[in-house]
Design a protein with these regions (language model features):
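C-terminal catalytic/acceptor-binding lobe
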Residues: 122-238
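A structural signal for short, well-ordered beta-strand segments and their strand-loop junctions
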Residues: 25-29, 76-81, 141-145, 188-190
């Protein structure tokens, strides 16, 4: 850990880390919400129009995935694999005609980052400690805040799409479709089948959903969360 104690010092450490290493660093979207993004692939500067950002993911869930690999943070953070190579998009870039911009990331998220400037709780300090440790392990992280938006006049929060990896043996797509505070499924595609955890299980009594088709992939890529859910339920009922 760097020799810093206050939240402000830790925040500045992260900011300077981004600047010194030619990462995107902090940038402002809303007046009171600040985001930070670090690109693993920093050999070519990324265009600002291709911001890879997601909004308000469950920080504790992400953190638990990391910590469960080891009791010691350092060992755990060094072995993060679940959330590698992730790509996110801005809300206004989500449309039926938009194409995904893929890049490689490891990310850790929190909806508390916007409170760092004036919140002195130990929880915030711990979050920043973890973020700094990620950076010191050579991981580049994305910290994001709460944000919601609409598609087709339906409130859809935290839609994100990503490619985790694509090699000769397997294609693995993961995307989060959070349609409400009560409904937070995680879906992914592996070996040609759409798989899921959390709330989808109560609808389908299984974590393995119907084989994916072009329509499913299109809805995933276009962020059509509600349409996808309806389609999957109908497919399951056949």
């Amino acid at each position: 850990m760097p020799d810093v104690s206050s939240i402000f010092e830790k925040r500045e450490y992260i900011r300077q880390f981004a600047i010194n290493n030619n990462y995107d660093g902090f940038f402002q979207i809303d007046d009171d919400v600040e985001y930070v993004a670090f690109s693993i692939e920093n050999s070519t500067p990324r265009k600002t129009s291709g911001a890879y950002i997601t909004y308000k993911c469950d920080f504790n869930m992400m953190l638990n995935r990391v910590i469960e690999k080891s009791i010691e943070h350092d060992a755990a953070l060094a072995s993060v694999t679940q959330y590698e190579n992730v790509c996110w998009r801005k809300p206004h870039e989500v449309s039926v005609n938009s194409k995904l911009n893929f890049a490689q990331f490891v990310y850790i998220t929190t909806d508390k980052i916007k409170d760092i400037s004036y919140d002195t709780s130990g929880e915030i300090n711990e979050d920043l400690d973890i973020l700094i440790r990620l950076l010191q392990h050579g991981r580049k992280a994305i910290c994001v805040c709460d944000y919601g938006f609409k598609i087709n006049n339906k409130a859809i929060h935290n839609i994100a799409t990503s490619t985790l990896y694509d090699n000769s043996l397997d294609k693995y797509y993961k995307f989060i479709l959070n349609t409400s505070a009560k409904y937070h499924p995680t879906l992914w595609v592996k070996n040609g089948r759409l798989r899921t955890r959390y709330h989808y299980k109560k609808y389908f009594n299984t974590t393995e959903l119907p084989p994916i088709d072009d329509k499913i992939l299109d809805m995933c890529k276009n962020g059509q969360a509600n349409e996808l859910i309806d389609y999957l339920i109908k497919q399951k009922e056949k």
